[in-house]
């Protein structure tokens, strides 16, 4: 009866008797390709989100200790550009922030690296990333339009929330504030913990 079934279907007896599914998979190039793809995808799923060796943060320096509160002149601030000193500070709207944890953005190679160690207020308010837009002396920002001042206030709020406020930017001739070790600025309580 089996011979009659084979003759009725017109199939080769060797195809029906030996190998079955495995024989079909390994003799068809398309099936081999699909099997290889399935194995590759399974490997990726099992391997999961393990970072590749080049994606690791081994080249990142360890976090720096929290900077004590103090005030800065524009000249003193310039030292904290991520090159001369590993810490990166920026002034916005008269406030100085430690943006070291945002090194990828504000470090020497970052898209906002031009602002490191500088008063970034004018550049952020006017959306200008040119070094020429930044002043070397204290910038009173009195010539900003109301829209630019509002933009600057938005940046100020974002930095206050995200980064450690370490002091203020001093005008020429202004005396620095003496801060106690325990003193935290009033806006620190509203800021998210690091």
Swiss-Prot record:
Subunit structure: Homodimer. Forms stable homodimer through hydrophobic heme-heme stacking interactions. Interacts with FECH; the interaction results in decreased FECH activity. Interacts with EGFR, CYP1A1 and CYP3A4; the interactions require PGRMC1 homodimerization. Interacts with TMEM97 and LDLR; the interaction increases LDL internalization.
Chain segments annotated as coiled-coil in the UniProt record: none
All ranges on the Cytoplasmic side of the membrane: 44-194
Record's comment describing the protein's domains: The cytochrome b5 heme-binding domain lacks the conserved iron-binding His residues at positions 106 and 130.
Protein name per the record: Membrane-associated progesterone receptor component 1
Residues annotated as signal peptide: none
Membrane topology reported for the UniProt record: Single-pass membrane protein
Sequence ranges assigned to domain Cytochrome b5 heme-binding in this UniProt record: 71-170
Modified residues (Phosphoserine): 54, 56, 180
